[in-house]
């Protein structure tokens, strides 16, 4: 039985919201290269790929502080040093995303959802300045009606603000929505928003298995969500998905756009 058949018996969600890093794309190689360049410029030894893999998922500021601390706990990192290091990291990461790749099954799943008329949104803790260019490079940006970066709203995941915002914009309820991610922050945000969450085993969760966070469903491949997508009897095959060239309009939610719609969110209580 597919993931959708388990979570939405007899129907489909009206809205599917996705995390980005560790869910749709493997960006750790480029992030690690930027972290190591930052550390070298500060006269420190590089951290390496596997260390960075355990540190990502909570935004650039936290990643930089973890790199300076050499671990998950970064409370003792000097704020001035962290600010200097963040600028170095942002400059380094902006230069190249050549090592970033889309995970297998992602494009098939996005095409299938679009063919079914399911609205899609992207909610990431990655700074918004990187999100649009990266999505364009990966050729998946046109699938998403709403795109929210980590510094778009006053809060980032695990706060549910972005999920609540997108559901309000889409005019759907939590019961009609699904969030797909790979980390504790994703699961916590979904639960706080009252939304079912699918956890992916291949992503970044600080070295912890995603099932330890108790998402609604755990899968190894996004295509496990799709009911019979490779079964010709359904009339929808992977060949159909790959041939689809339709494009949807996309709303990239920037900081300026946020100021225009903040009044519409007044009924939500922002958590400190």
UniProtKB/Swiss-Prot annotation:
Q: One GO cellular component from the entry?
A: cytosol
Tell me the function of this protein.
Answer: Specifically catalyzes the dephosphorylation of 2-phosphoglycolate. Is involved in the dissimilation of the intracellular 2-phosphoglycolate formed during the DNA repair of 3'-phosphoglycolate ends, a major class of DNA lesions induced by oxidative stress.
Instruction: Please give the organism.
Output: Pseudomonas putida (strain ATCC 47054 / DSM 6125 / CFBP 8728 / NCIMB 11950 / KT2440)
Give the keywords, sorted.
Answer: Carbohydrate metabolism, Hydrolase, Magnesium, Metal-binding
Q: In which pathway does it act?
A: Organic acid metabolism; glycolate biosynthesis; glycolate from 2-phosphoglycolate: step 1/1
Q: Which residues does the annotation say bind Mg(2+)? A: 19, 21, 182
Q: Catalysed reaction per UniProt?
A: 2-phosphoglycolate + H2O = glycolate + phosphate
Q: Which family does this protein fall into?
A: Belongs to the HAD-like hydrolase superfamily. CbbY/CbbZ/Gph/YieH family.
The GO terms this record gives for MF are: metal ion binding; phosphoglycolate phosphatase activity
Cofactor(s) the protein needs? Mg(2+)
GO BP of this protein: carbohydrate metabolic process; DNA repair; glycolate biosynthetic process
Q: Where is the active site?
A: 19
Q: What is this protein called?
A: Phosphoglycolate phosphatase
Q: What class of enzyme is it?
A: hydrolase
Write down the EC number: 3.1.3.18
């Amino acid at each position: 039985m597919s993931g959708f058949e388990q979570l939405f018996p007899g129907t489909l969600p009206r809205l599917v919201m996705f995390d980005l890093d560790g869910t749709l794309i493997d960006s750790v190689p480029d992030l690690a290269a930027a972290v190591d360049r930052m550390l070298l410029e500060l006269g420190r030894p590089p951290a390496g790929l596997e260390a960075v893999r355990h540190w990502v998922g909570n935004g650039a500021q936290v990643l930089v502080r973890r790199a300076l601390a050499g671990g998950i706990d970064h409370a003792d990192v000097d704020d001035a040093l962290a600010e200097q290091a963040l600028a170095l990291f942002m400059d380094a990461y902006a230069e190249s995303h050549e090592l970033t790749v889309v995970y297998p099954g992602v494009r098939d799943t996005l095409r299938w959802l679009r063919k079914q008329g399911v609205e899609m949104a992207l909610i990431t803790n990655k700074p918004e300045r990187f999100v649009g260019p990266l999505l364009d490079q990966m050729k998946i940006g046109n699938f998403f009606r709403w795109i929210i970066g980590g510094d778009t709203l006053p809060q980032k995941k695990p706060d549910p603000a972005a999920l609540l915002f997108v559901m309000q914009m889409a005019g759907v309820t939590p019961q009609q929505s699904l969030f797909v991610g790979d980390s504790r922050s994703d699961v916590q945000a979904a639960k706080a928003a009252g939304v079912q969450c699918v956890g992916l085993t291949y992503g970044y969760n600080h070295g912890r298995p995603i099932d330890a966070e108790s998402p609604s469903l755990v899968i190894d491949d996004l295509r496990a969500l799709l009911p019979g997508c490779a079964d010709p009897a359904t009339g929808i095959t992977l060949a159909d998905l790959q041939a689809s060239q339709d494009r949807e309009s996309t709303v990239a939610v920037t900081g300026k756009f946020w100021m225009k719609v903040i009044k519409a969110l007044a009924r939500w209580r922002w958590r400190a």
